[in-house]
C-alpha cells in the first residue's frame, strides 16, 4: 500500500478509473491481501464495486491477471497497481473498440540522452561521424491495457507469467 501524498497509490488509481467511467474493479491480490481488503472493502466509499482475485503466491503480471478470469466476461481494463496515469482512459477504450484489437497498450514516448559520444565507423575502422551525447526516443509500456476476455486464454493458470509474453502471443496471432 505504497503512499502518494495522503492516500495509497491504489486509491489514486481507483479514483482515476472511476473518473474515466469504470464502475467495477477487480483487485488481484497476493501477499498484501489483508491490508488491501481492509482498506478498500467493497469499494462503495470510493464510488466503485470492488471484488478480489486472490493468489497465494506471486504470479507476475499476467499470472495475477489470470486469477481474475472468473470476474471477466467483456472488454476490460488492466492497470498495474504501482503507476499513476494522467490521460483519458475513456479515449483509450474508444480507440480499442474502434481498432477491434484484442489488446490496446498505453505507451509513453520516453526521451533520454546517452551519457557518451556515439562514433560511427566504416568497416576498416575509419571514423565517419561523431554525435556527442545524442538524444534517443523509445515508446515504453506504462502498464495500462484495454483487453478482450479471450486474451486470458493465452495465460497459463497458477504459474508466474509476464505480460510481455501475453503481448508477444497476441502479436503472433495478429490481433
Model-derived features: where do they sit?
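Conserved beta-loop-beta/alpha segment of the NTase-like Rossmann-fold superfamily
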Residues: 37-123, 154-156
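Short, well-ordered beta-strand micro-motif
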Residues: 3, 120, 146-148
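Catalytic-core segments of class I nucleotidyltransferases/pyrophosphorylases
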Residues: 76-77, 84, 90-97, 111-113, ...
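Glycine-rich phosphate-binding loop at the start of an alpha helix
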Residues: 11, 62, 164
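N-terminal glycine-rich phosphate-binding loop and ensuing alpha1 helix
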Residues: 1-37
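A structural signal for short hydrophobic beta-strand segments in well-ordered beta-sheet cores
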Residues: 1, 118-121, 167
Amino acid at each position: 500500500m505504497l503512499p502518494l501524498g495522503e492516500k495509497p497509490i491504489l486509491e489514486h488509481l481507483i479514483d482515476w478509473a472511476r473518473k474515466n467511467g469504470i464502475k467495477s474493479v477487480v483487485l488481484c491480490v497476493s501477499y498484501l491481501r489483508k491490508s488491501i481488503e481492509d482498506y478498500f472493502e467493497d469499494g462503495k466509499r470510493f464510488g466503485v464495486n470492488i471484488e478480489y482475485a486472490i493468489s497465494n503466491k506471486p504470479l507476475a503480471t499476467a499470472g495475477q491477471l489470470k486469477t481474475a478470469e472468473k470476474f471477466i466476461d467483456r472488454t476490460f481494463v488492466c492497470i498495474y497497481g504501482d503507476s499513476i496515469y494522467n490521460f483519458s482512459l475513456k479515449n483509450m477504450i474508444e480507440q480499442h473498440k474502434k481498432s477491434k484489437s484484442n489488446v490496446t497498450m498505453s505507451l509513453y514516448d520516453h526521451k533520454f540522452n546517452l551519457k557518451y559520444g556515439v562514433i560511427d565507423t566504416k568497416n576498416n575502422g575509419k571514423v565517419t561521424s561523431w554525435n556527442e551525447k545524442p538524444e534517443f526516443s523509445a515508446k515504453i509500456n506504462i502498464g495500462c491495457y484495454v483487453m478482450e476476455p479471450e486474451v486470458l486464454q493465452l495465460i497459463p493458470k497458477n504459474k508466474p507469467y509476464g505480460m510481455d509474453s501475453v503481448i508477444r502471443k497476441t502479436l503472433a496471432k495478429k490481433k
